[in-house]
Design a protein with these regions (language model features):
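Helix-loop boundary and gating motifs at the non-cytosolic
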Residues: 1-47, 211, 220-239
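Hydrophobic core of transmembrane alpha-helices in multi-pass small-molecule transporters
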Residues: 12, 94-118, 301-315
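Intracellular juxtamembrane helix-capping segments at the cytosolic ends
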Residues: 25, 118-131, 315-328
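Transmembrane alpha-helices of Major Facilitator/SLC transporters
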Residues: 48-52, 248-271
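Helix-to-loop junctions at the C-terminal end of transmembrane segments
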Residues: 53-66, 262-275, 359
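C-terminal ends and interior cores of transmembrane alpha-helices
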Residues: 75-98, 285-297
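Cytoplasmic helix-loop-helix junction between adjacent transmembrane helices
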Residues: 108-147
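C-terminal transmembrane helical hairpin of 12-TM major facilitator-type secondary transporters
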Residues: 275-320
Length: 392
C-alpha cells in the first residue's frame, strides 16, 4: 500500500496537534482565572464528540469516498485550531468573563473533536480497503506507531513553545493539520464511488464487532486511567513533593510512550500473525503490567509496571482495528471503523470519571480494575477463538 507513509505522516501531524493542547491547558485555565473542572470538561468533551461523530464519518466515507472525508477532517481540525488559538490570544489580552472563555474554548474544542473523529476512522477504513486481511494488523500497527510519536511530540514541543506565550503552541500546531491537508490532497488517490443502493451500517450491538469494541474501550479506558491517576499515585505512594512528582510523572509517561510505540513497531514487522493472537498476548502482558503497578514498592518498580502495561496495550491497539476490518464486508469498512473508534471515545469519557472515583476509595483500585479488565479481555479472546473453532 503506497499511501501508508502519507497516512502515517498525516496521523502523526494531527495527533501531535491534538496532544499539544494538553501541555498548555492547565496554564491557560489558570491564566484566564478559570477552574480546574473547566479543563476536565474541555478534555472529556473530545471523547463525547468522538463517540457521536466517528460512526457518522465512517458511514459517510463509505458513501462518498475516503479522500473527501479525510480532507474535510484535517482541514476542519486546522481551521478549528486557529479559532482556538485566536480566541486564547485575544482572551489573554483583555481577560473576558469566565463564562465567555469557557463557552468559546468548549466550542473550539468541540469543533476540533468533530473533525478529528474523521481522521483515525477513515485512515483505518482506507487501510482495510487497500490491504489484504492477513497484512492489515501490520499496517494498522504502522499507523498506530506514527500516532504514538505524535502523542509524545505534541506535549513535548508544545510545552517548549509555551515559553514564548501560551497561544504560541496553538498557532504553531494549527499549521500541522493544514500541512496534513496538503498531503491528503496530493498523495491520497480519489477512489471511484461504489455504485451500491444502500451501504450496510453495523450497529453497536453487532456481534461481529463485539470483541474489538470491548478491546478498544478497555484499552483507551486504561490509557486515560494511567494519564489521570499517575500524578496522584506518585505523590501519595512515593511521598514526593509536587515539583519532583511532576518530573517523575513526566519521565514515566515518556517511557510509556516509547514502549507503546515499540510494541506497534514489532507488530508491524511480523507477518501473518492473526489479530486474535496479538489480542491475547497483549492482554496477558497488560494484566501483568498493571499487577506490578498496584503491588509496587518503589519508583523503579512503578515505572517498570507501567512500561510493561503500555507494551501490552501497544500490541492490542492494531489488533482490534484489524480484527474489526476482517470481520465485516468491503462495503461496511468505514462504518465498522467508526463503530470501533466510538468505543475508544467512550473509554475517554468513562476513564477519567471511573478512575478518579476508584482512586478516592483506594489509590490502587484504578490499577487493580485495569489488571482485571485485561485478564477478562484475554478470557473473551480465548472464548471467541473457541467459538470460531466450534461454530458456536
Amino acid at each position: 500500500m503506497k499511501e501508508i507513509k502519507s497516512l502515517m505522516v498525516i496521523n502523526l501531524l494531527c495527533v501531535a496537534a491534538m496532544m499539544a493542547f494538553l501541555a498548555v491547558v492547565g496554564p491557560i485555565i489558570r491564566a484566564l482565572h478559570m477552574q480546574e473542572w473547566h479543563a476536565g470538561l474541555t478534555v472529556a468533551l473530545a471523547g463525547v464528540v468522538w463517540v457521536v461523530m466517528a460512526r457518522y464519518w465512517g458511514r459517510k466515507s463509505d458513501k462518498v469516498g475516503r479522500k473527501p472525508i479525510l480532507l474535510m477532517g484535517v482541514l476542519g481540525v486546522g481551521v478549528s485550531y486557529l479559532l482556538l488559538a485566536s480566541y486564547i490570544d485575544f482572551a489573554l489580552l483583555i481577560m473576558p468573563p469566565v463564562v465567555l472563555s469557557l463557552g468559546m474554548i468548549v466550542l473550539a474544542r468541540a469543533l476540533i473533536g468533530v473533525f478529528y473523529a474523521a481522521i483515525p476512522t477513515v485512515s483505518n477504513a482506507l487501510i482495510a480497503d487497500k490491504v489484504v486481511a492477513s497484512e492489515r494488523t501490520n499496517y494498522m500497527a504502522k499507523l498506530g506507531a506514527s500516532s504514538g510519536f505524535g502523542m509524545i511530540l505534541g506535549p513535548a514541543v508544545g510545552g517548549y513553545l509555551a515559553v514564548y506565550g501560551l497561544s504560541t503552541p496553538l498557532y504553531a500546531f494549527a499549521i500541522l493539520p493544514l500541512m496534513a491537508a496538503f498531503l491528503v490532497y496530493k498523495t491520497i488517490p480519489k477512489a471511484p464511488k461504489k455504485h451500491v443502493e444502500e451501504v450496510p451500517h453495523p450497529k453497536w450491538s453487532d456481534v461481529r464487532l463485539r470483541l474489538p469494541m470491548i478491546a478498544a474501550f478497555l484499552t483507551m479506558y486504561s490509557v486515560v486511567t494511567s494519564q489521570v491517576c499517575l500524578g496522584f499515585f506518585v505523590i501519595d505512594k512515593l511521598a514526593l513533593d509536587p515539583t519532583l512528582s511532576a518530573k517523575v510523572t513526566g519521565y514515566i509517561l515518556s517511557l510509556v510512550g516509547v514502549c507503546f510505540i515499540l510494541a506497534q513497531i514489532i507488530v508491524s514487522k511480523r507477518q501473518g500473525v492473526f489479530p486474535q493472537k496479538w489480542l491475547l498476548l497483549g492482554s496477558t502482558i497488560a494484566t501483568i503490567g498493571y499487577g506490578i503497578v498496584f503491588m509496587m514498592t518503589s519508583g523503579v518498580m512503578l515505572g517498570f509496571g507501567f512500561c510493561i502495561a503500555a507494551f501490552g496495550m501497544g500490541l492490542i491497539f492494531p489488533a482490534f482495528q484489524a480484527f474489526a476490518a476482517n470481520s465485516v464486508s468491503e462495503a461496511e469498512q468505514g462504518a465498522a471503523a467508526g463503530t470501533v473508534s466510538s468505543a475508544q471515545g467512550l473509554g475517554i469519557i468513562i476513564g477519567p470519571l471511573a478512575s478518579t472515583a476508584l482512586y478516592g476509595l483506594n489509590p490502587i483500585f484504578p490499577f487493580v480494575v485495569a489488571s482485571i479488565a485485561f485478564a477478562l479481555l484475554g478470557v473473551f479472546t480465548l472464548r471467541h477463538k473457541a467459538c470460531m473453532t466450534s461454530s458456536c
